[in-house]
Amino acid sequence: MANLTSDQMPDTVGGPGPFTFDLPVDAGSKVYKGSLCTQLTATGMVVPYSTAAAGVVVGVADHAADLTAAGTSDGDKRVRIQTKRMFAFTNGTAGDAFSEATLIGSLVYGTDDNTVAKTSNSQARKAVGFFYGMESDGKVRVLVDPALAAIVNVLQGLTDTPASADALRDNIVAAFG
């Protein structure tokens, strides 16, 4: 294909967001409508966000899904996830609370499936998105973006301090395979 020689808009695939997609729910989990959700690294199943869940934050549940009954298996139900969208979450407390003075674009970390905080708590919390202001009721506006949050989480897990841009690039390549 040749380079463009005049204005032309490419076809859009999905648009700029928000995106919705259905993911399988982990057996033993109950996802509430509005829960911040994590996709587990080991199985690909979705669970409500918690600091203990190993995986990436993927978005917010559009409806409830309950797989806590005996005899249920991974993926018996799916939950629709909304992502790359702005959501309002409960603000953290004390030194972890956001305020109007917080800079737009600051990282936001999850503390549970409905609460966010300003710090990673020594990397115990995962990044879930970016700060976009405060609501009048004190809730925090967060742009939930799993791709960018995953990059931040990997970079924060690096144990060395790269000496150069080349070393940083090597770390990123190693982290993402």
Residue spans for each PLM region:
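Surface-exposed, low-hydrophobicity beta-strand/loop segments enriched in small/polar/acidic residues
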Residues: M1-G177
